[in-house]
Amino acid sequence: MIQRLQNLYLTKVQTTLTEQFQYKNTHEIPRLEKIVINRGVGSASQNTKLLESLADELTILAGQRPIVKRAKKAIAGFGVREDMPIGLTVTLRGERMYAFYDRLVNLALPRIRDFQGISPKNFDGHGNYTLGLTEQLMFPEVSYEQIDQVCGMDISIVTTASTDREGHGLLKELGMPFKAGSVN
């Protein structure tokens, strides 16, 4: 089943971007490649039940099970030992990626209190965008009673765009609510 945003990309966004950036080849047109969701576990690294709860939450949000990232070496200043769980990561591609992006843009971001739009300055220089969220409660799949710990996440949207302007144009056409302002 083709996702709504994927269909929008194929029918409208490709032609709009071709006109805007004067592409000569259809393979030059930027597209979404993947969405990577990272979440640090903090104190949950000591508590396996809490770690499982955070992993289950991320599974509900992303539609697939996260990978537990472990410390490669001990850092005494942070109280981290080698092989201790320090984060959760999910990489979304294809239909799951478009479904998550659709829910993020149309359901989750508008539920943020006093939401004015997101900053257009978080591009990395190669057309990829990273967004930090402070809590998971903005997603309709997560209810306040379900969660054990309020915890944010970083969402990286990786595109095939070669410049920030192209990446901004792609995400804007796909419905990302940017604040007024210029890209780096």
UniProtKB/Swiss-Prot annotation:
Subcellular compartments: Plastid, Chloroplast
PANTHER family tied to this protein: 60S RIBOSOMAL PROTEIN L11-RELATED
Organism from which the protein derives: Ostreococcus tauri
Paired cysteines (S-S): none
Pfam families reported for this sequence: Ribosomal_L5, Ribosomal_L5_C
Similarity section: Belongs to the universal ribosomal protein uL5 family.
Keywords: Chloroplast, Plastid, Ribonucleoprotein, Ribosomal protein, RNA-binding, rRNA-binding
GO cellular component: chloroplast; ribonucleoprotein complex; ribosome
GO molecular function terms listed in the Swiss-Prot or TrEMBL record: rRNA binding; structural constituent of ribosome
Example GO BP: translation
Protein known as: Large ribosomal subunit protein uL5c
Described purpose of this protein according to its UniProt entry: Binds 5S rRNA, forms part of the central protuberance of the 50S subunit.
Binding partners and assembly: Part of the 50S ribosomal subunit; contacts the 5S rRNA.
InterPro entries from the UniProt entry: Ribosomal_uL5 (IPR002132), Ribosomal_uL5_bac-type (IPR020930), Ribosomal_uL5_C (IPR031309), Ribosomal_uL5_dom_sf (IPR022803), Ribosomal_uL5_N (IPR031310)
